[in-house]
């Protein structure tokens, strides 16, 4: 009787754990921007960027990675941000060819 009760408890625990894992959406972003930098960053300092467009985040953003390995959130609507992304895209295309 005790063995079957222990087995039942283990089975229920395993079921609850698997339900929690399945309930987690796979597309939860690992990073969101809550504050945007207002300061223009020199293109020479930038290494790469990442667009944050998930509806799970409070706002759309671009995260620039600098050569000093800093991450800076900026507004993707800013003209200088769009120019910097274009520059980095062209730079990465030249490196690939």
Swiss-Prot record:
Glycosylated residue positions: 94
Q: So which residues are the signal peptide here?
A: 1-23
Gene Ontology CC entries for this record:
extracellular space
Q: Which InterPro entries match?
A: Chemokine_b/g/d (IPR039809), Chemokine_CC_CS (IPR000827), Chemokine_IL8-like_dom (IPR001811), Interleukin_8-like_sf (IPR036048)
Question: Could you mention a single GO BP entry for this protein?
Answer: negative regulation of neurogenesis
Q: Where are the transmembrane segments?
A: none
Which Pfam families has this protein been placed in? IL8 (PF00048)
Q: Indicate whether Amino-acid biosynthesis appears among the record's keywords.
A: no
Organism domain of life: Eukaryota
Alphabetical keyword list: Chemotaxis, Cytokine, Disulfide bond, Glycoprotein, Inflammatory response, Secreted, Signal
Cystine residue pairs? 32-57, 33-73
Q: Which SMART domains match?
A: SCY (SM00199)
Family, as annotated: Belongs to the intercrine beta (chemokine CC) family.
Q: What does this protein do?
A: In response to the presence of allergens, this protein directly promotes the accumulation of eosinophils (a prominent feature of allergic inflammatory reactions), but not lymphocytes, macrophages or neutrophils. Attracts eosinophils in vitro but is not responsible for eosinophilia in the ovary. Binds to CCR3.
Q: What is this protein called?
A: Eotaxin
Q: Which organism is it from?
A: Bos taurus (Bovine)
Its encoding gene is what? CCL11
